Amino acid sequence: MNEQYSAMRGNVSMLGKLLGDTIKDALGEEILDRVETIRRLSKSSRAGNEASRQALLNTLQNLSNDELLPVARAFSQFLNLANVAEQYHRISPHGEAASNPDALYHLFTRLKNKNLDEAQIRQAVDNLSIELVLTAHPTEIARRTLIHKLVEVNTCLSQLDHDDLADYERHQIMRRLRQLVAQSWHTDEIRKNRPTPIDEAKWGYAVVENSLWEGVPAFLREFNEQLEKSLGYQLPVEAVPVRFTAWMGGDRDGNPNVTAEVTRRALLLSRWKAAELFLRDVQVLVSELSMTVCTPELRALAGEHTQEPYREVLKRLRQQLNNTLTYLDARLRGERLPRPADLLVSNDQLWQPLHTCYRSLKACGMGIIANGQLLDTLRRVHCFGVPLVRIDIRQESTRHTEALAELTRYLGLGDYETWSEEDKQTFLLRELNSKRPLVPRHWTPSPETKEVFDTCQVIAEAPAGAIAAYVISMARTPSDVLAVHLLLKEAGCPYNLPVVPLFETLDDLNNAEAVMTQLLSIDWYRGFIQGKQMVMIGYSDSAKDAGVMAASWAQYRAQEALVRVCDNAGIALTLFHGRGGSIGRGGAPAHDALLSQPPGSLKSGLRVTEQGEMIRFKLGLPEIAVSSLTLYTSAILEANLLPPPAPKQEWRDVMDELSQTSCALYRRYIRKNPDFVPYFRSATPELELGKLPLGSRPAKRRPSGGVESLRAIPWIFAWTQNRLMLPAWLGAGTALEEAMTEGHRGTLENMYRSWPFFTTRIDMLEMVFAKSDLWLAEYYDQRLVDPALWPLGTELRQQVQRDIQAVLTIADTDHLMADLPWAAESIALRNVYTDPLNVLQAELLYRSRHQEQPDANVEQALMVTIAGVAAGMRNTG
């Protein structure tokens, strides 16, 4: 174990020393000594030395206002560097990658040992569909400019990881590392302004350009090699099991800053970036494909008189890409150029000339050339294509209801909003079947309603394939889905866009089966969807509504029911998982999360959100992206070919009890305890989080209101900061404890050993408890909370201790994370640096709340501690 982590610890130590040298150069020996003293005290405190803990508290409480910011920045920046070292460890030949066998090779070996029919495996590979939806949730706290520097630090670590480096080469790399660490130190880590939705969209496109553009073809090459080695089967050229969609620029749910015009601009920007990236690819191909021998098919395309037919075809495509770039550039500047005759609007325009070159090279005995850069480009065409990433539109159901109500009132038909569900459906289906338009040409709607109609107009004008789906948040009835279909029809949408209901509260999840059964019984609807249905399961809001245990069971049961309903109706169901990065929002290691899904729920593929900082941790580097995509692929193939058994009725009964008990306790605190909201507001930096310019979306659905109006992300962000992690465990451990008291211990232990769903739930609770810290949570209370509310904090911390014991009993282990030593090592490594930031944050919150005049140093240092704790916890919300 120690050997495996020695390389990572060595990198962490080296980066820490470089940061120390930078601080000394910038601020002098005295500040560096202060930082080192705090680090040593923190390390000793973590080892259980009570005197060191008290000294740590005294030292941080007595920092002058001028010392606050440098100390906060030192520990925050160290955690960023430690995260880079840990991320590199995942892909290093001397790290985790070396000790873990290839996930796909391991899976194919197991499948063979299970005597699975090769045709069955091949069919599962052919049907493989992974769609990752990049979202702009405001959990990526690091600035893009710092992320670029950290990516280059990773590159330097990779370069140093070679035994054959000459001394001067090693010296040059170390010099570059010093420069990067110094650049980071002298860069403000906190944004001054909130990013706009277009800034967020550009960040998403940068992930594609800097990582996925290389990462996806590299993953497909590795996947193909494993298929050849294990099955003697090659991945077809046109098979691309991975696709990417974005919510940046399309998700307007609760975000008034995402307008129809913003979506139109995001669509243009993504097409512009795609054209630019494909132009680079084609330029390389023009220089590489100088061959003269070709098929008659390519000769006919290139013309009879050219000596270099491949180059001739590719030069035309290059010109087409240049023309497309010029046109899109003008559109983005607000100019109206005539549309070029050869404007690229469909993937087929890219695919055909490239694939003709590919077929010619293969037919003429040049397969080795065809399967190089050209194959990578062809796979990019299928994965990214002309849109680069497709965009989802998301809007709340009530916005559509209000828009239609305004229209029906204008037309003298009554108030749609007040109609019964039956009357709404009758009206919607009549209009969907009508050949005449419903919206009068000269009607002037309110700005809110105009925005809904304008969005549908943007969808109608977008090239087919640029928009992936229209997601309806807070969908509760069949009319919520039919209403969007009518709005799109009225906009003249020329293609059948998937309209996706999102079920996200406990009641909505429990009602999902009834809603979809009713929808699929409607003849018009069945005819329109042509045998395919997508449904989104919301993890964040259901967990905030009912607690993680009740929410996870409701999500599982809803998925089972939806699979059953669609199977009975002969409909192919794709479940869209709206998971967050944190446990309280459905986050879990991808492999475990997928294997814990109900049997049959992944047979039409996987669609899942990748949120905020998790995009950087899982997809931010080409090698990391390859690793993440490999894990997704192996997990989906395993879930479909070796599905877990359906849970026994006895297990279901126990889960029903756990769900009811945990939900009741969770809601008793959150909704019924009058002390809870004041305690939450004072014990966490919830109010101060609103000052952080994290994302373009407001933190609350309504400016006034309590916990219920808070979005799931800031709700979890706040509890993560004070280390109580409450949303990720409240209610769950108590329910387990009560179930054991009632004689279910043996059943729970059996469930943990034999049911992946339950195993993942318990493992995730272990992870949360390992990241939580009760002495720090208590310190926040003592420093910030009215003593009259202290009993509530004490009660919650005692609850955590009992919950930990319940989890350890069921897992039959003496300490947390016994089966996940890598994660335990990672948490332990960062705690030494996160603890001082937590103590400092509590001190800064105290000063900030008690000062008569705002102090810029205090405010800035507080923001830095929030960013630093987020880095230390490896997730925000």
Curated annotation (Swiss-Prot):
The UniProt record lists the EC number as 4.1.1.31
Domain of life of the organism encoding this protein: Bacteria
PROSITE patterns linked to this entry: PEPCASE_1 (PS00781), PEPCASE_2 (PS00393)
The cofactors named for this UniProt entry are: Mg(2+)
Instruction: Output the Gene Ontology cellular-component terms.
Output: cytosol
Catalysed reactions listed for this entry: oxaloacetate + phosphate = phosphoenolpyruvate + hydrogencarbonate
Enzymatic class: lyase
What does the UniProt keyword field contain?
Carbon dioxide fixation, Lyase, Magnesium
Catalytic residues identified in the record: 137, 544
GO terms for MF: magnesium ion binding; phosphoenolpyruvate carboxylase activity
Record keyword Ion transport present: no
Q: Name one GO biological process term.
A: carbon fixation
Disulfide linkages recorded for this protein, renumbered to the chain, are none
Biological function: Forms oxaloacetate, a four-carbon dicarboxylic acid source for the tricarboxylic acid cycle.
Q: Which family does it belong to?
A: Belongs to the PEPCase type 1 family.
The protein's name:
Phosphoenolpyruvate carboxylase
Instruction: List the source organism.
Output: Edwardsiella ictaluri (strain 93-146)
Encoding gene, per UniProt annotation: ppc
